[in-house]
Curated annotation (Swiss-Prot):
Chain positions with Phosphothreonine modification: 197
Gene: dnaK
Keywords: ATP-binding, Chaperone, Nucleotide-binding, Phosphoprotein, Stress response
Entry-linked NCBIfam families: PRK00290.1, PRK05183.1, prok_dnaK
Record's protein name: Chaperone protein DnaK
Cited HAMAP family: DnaK
Entry keyword annotation includes Chloroplast: no
Species this protein is from: Rickettsia rickettsii (strain Sheila Smith)
Length: 627
């Protein structure tokens, strides 16, 4: 079994790690950074991933996709999706299956596809470091992700060419990294406030056993929301001062978003910062500039309710675990937003203790995923991870009631069966509608999917016995079966969201990804060939100007001919032809090199004589013998 990589697929940034010997290690990307922006851009037929995509976002806002994790596994009509639509500069569109997709460069992409591009970058980063092909991974998700979101994340891994051995909850991964090779028994809380999601998990750690007691959270609360508050504040201030609404200008929005994120980070260590955006827009009176002094106190006032929103899930998680805040021996901070002093203050106030800051909040989740990868391929022993399902699972029964089969915070994997019956006389089929959530009425919860059980023998209502079995695997993904006990008829299904990607769609996206990988490789090869050719043209022209008179007319003609031939194909898209003409010019220009060395060797004796002459100076001297 090869190396299993651990990937933290984040809303804002992603990170990849691997077990090296007995220690997990974060792998640096090609730019030398330990995290990669979760940003994809499409520009002039090219796909950019990570830092290169982020750099050009200001000039290409419509085709630069970020924070797609907030859309994954969500329906287009989801209120949270509608909320994001008014904020992001790119288009969020309705897919044929009702899901929220994104549009860029006149193409539609599912959030799973966009996530797959980021995962491919992580995969390449690991392969470049390991010098070997990587095919297996453990990918992290927010603990409060529902089944549809988990399935969509697994689909993203498949599209990226990865076998996803395990989907692991982010706080659980962080706890693994925190408690790795520590023998002390502890009850800990992991407070994870990332770029787009918030989770809190309560765990008991003892002798290598990591048992999650409860989890809670909000999959639409994170750093992006903090950025939006600052962004809206800047828009309001500018509108009051200049009477211009910047919210309608995608270019200005992108610049404001970057400035908001930068200011937020700076105010974690400073108490005041200047936001300067020259030429943010223009009107009939000329260009307009944005120049605002922004303080930490102003920021804290803007986001106070967002920080407060993280406290209620903490309270619920403690209650579900059967603990009081005073029972928690350590609070581990995870996610970039936990660097904010006001967040740390709120955590300290609620739990009554100083939070633990000994882990890197940007890297700890990927490290934990790598440890879990090590467990799965037997590199790491003596660790047992017991996770839970974050939400209750059940089916819709008579009157639209939500009947729970598996309660939230049940340890997974788990299996539960319950017998139901028909609602009408001689009913020959039943529709099983599967929901996930905590509300009492089915319609108020998340519909995961539905299927039919047909061929039930005619009988009075209430007589047939239909056994419904829920099976949740270690990834937190739901499998459901329904069986008529009288006829033995059975229907099994792995729940696919009412939207979601079909197997055929995933297969097509896998092929597209492979094809794009080939095209990207070819594109890179073409660019490298053009760069080499361009460099050779420049150096040949320069040396030809300096030493052309030293060449015979035949040699000079051959070089000029090869030079003209290469210049003629520089703009072509034919890599082989460019390489061929580059090789021809390289061979022809060797004559220039010979002429250069010959000229240098001929001038050397003269140079030496010149040097000796330079040492002769006039001097007075006396003839000693005549003295």
């Amino acid at each position: 079994m090869g190396k299993v990589i651990g990937i933290d697929l984040g809303t804002t940034n992603s990170c990849v790690a691997v077990m090296e010997g007995k220690e997990p290690k974060v792998i640096e990307n090609a730019e030398g950074e330990r995290t990669t922006p979760s940003i994809i851009a499409f520009a002039n037929g090219e796909k950019l991933v990570g830092q290169s995509a982020k750099r050009q976002a200001v000039t290409n806002p419509r085709n630069t996709i970020y924070a797609v994790k907030r859309l994954i596994g969500r329906n287009f009509i989801d209120p949270m999706v509608r909320k994001d639509q008014g904020i992001v500069p790119y288009n969020i569109v309705k897919a044929d299956n009702g899901d929220a997709w994104v549009e860029a460069d006149n193409n539609k992409y599912s959030p799973s596809q966009i996530s797959a591009f980021i995962l491919q970058k992580m995969k390449e980063t690991a392969e470049n470091y390991l010098g070997d092909k990587v095919t297996q991974a453990v990918i992290t998700v927010p603990a409060y992700f529902n089944d549809a979101q988990r399935q969509a994340t697994k689909d993203a891994g498949k599209i990226a060419g990865l076998e996803v051995l395990r989907i692991i909850n982010e706080p659980t991964a962080a706890a693994l990294a925190y408690g790795f090779e520590k023998s002390a028994s502890k009850t800990i809380a992991v407070y994870d406030l990332g770029g787009g999601t918030f989770d809190v998990s309560i765990l008991e750690i003892s002798d290598g056993v990591f048992e999650v007691k409860s989890t809670n959270g909000d999959t639409f609360l994170g750093g992006e929301d903090f950025d939006t508050r600052i962004l809206n504040h800047l828009i309001d201030v500018f509108k009051k001062e200049n009477g211009i609404d910047l919210s309608k200008d995608p270019l200005a929005l992108q610049r404001l978003k970057e400035a908001a994120e930068k200011a937020k980070k700076e105010l974690s260590s400073a108490v005041t910062t200047d936001i300067n955006l020259p030429y943010i827009t223009a009107d009939s009176s000329g260009p307009k500039h944005l120049n605002i002094k922004f303080t930490r106190a102003e920021l804290e006032k803007l986001v106070d309710d967002l920080i407060e929103k993280t406290i209620e899930p903490c309270r619920k998680a403690l209650q579900d675990a059967g603990f009081k805040a005073s029972d928690i021996q350590e609070v581990v901070l995870v996610g970039g937003m936990t660097r904010m002093p006001k967040v740390q203050e709120a955590v300290k106030k609620f739990f009554g203790r100083e939070p633990h800051k000994g882990v890197n909040p940007d890297e700890v989740v990927a490290l934990g995923a790598a440890i879990q990868g090590g467990v799965l391929n037997k590199e790491v022993t003596d660790i047992l991870l017991l996770d839970v399902t974050p939400l209750s699972l059940g089916i819709e029964t008579l009157g639209g009631v939500f009947t729970r089969l598996i309660d939230r915070n049940t340890t997974i994997p788990t299996k539960k069966s319950q017998v139901f019956s028909t609602a009408d006389d001689n009913q020959h089929a039943v529709t099983i509608r599967v929901f996930q959530g905590e509300r009492e009425m089915a319609k108020d919860n998340k519909l995961l999917g539905q299927f039919n059980l047909e061929g039930i023998p005619p009988a009075p209502r209430g007589l047939p016995q239909i056994e419904v079995t829920f099976d949740i695997d270690a990834n937190g993904i739901v499998h459901v079966s329904a069986k008529d006990k009288a006829s033995g008829k059975e229907q099994k299904v792995t729940i696919q969201a009412s939207g979601g990607l079909s197997d055929a769609e995933i297969e097509q996206m896998v092929k597209d990804a492979e094809q794009n990988a080939d095209e990207d490789k070819k594109r890179k090869e073409l660019i490298e060939a053009k760069n080499a050719a361009d460099s050779l043209v420049y150096s040949t022209e320069k040396t030809l100007t300096e030493y052309g008179d030293k060449l015979s007319s035949d040699d000079k003609g051959a070089v000029e001919e090869a030079l003209a031939a290469l210049k003629a194909v520089l703009e072509s898209e034919d890599t082989a032809l460019i390489k061929e003409k580059t090789a021809s010019l390289t061979a022809a220009s060797m004559k220039i090199g010979e002429a250069m060395y010959k000229a240098q060797s001929e001038s050397q004796p003269a140079a030496e004589n010149a040097t000796n002459d330079e040492k002769i100076v006039d001097a007075d001297f006396q003839d000693v013998e005549k003295k």
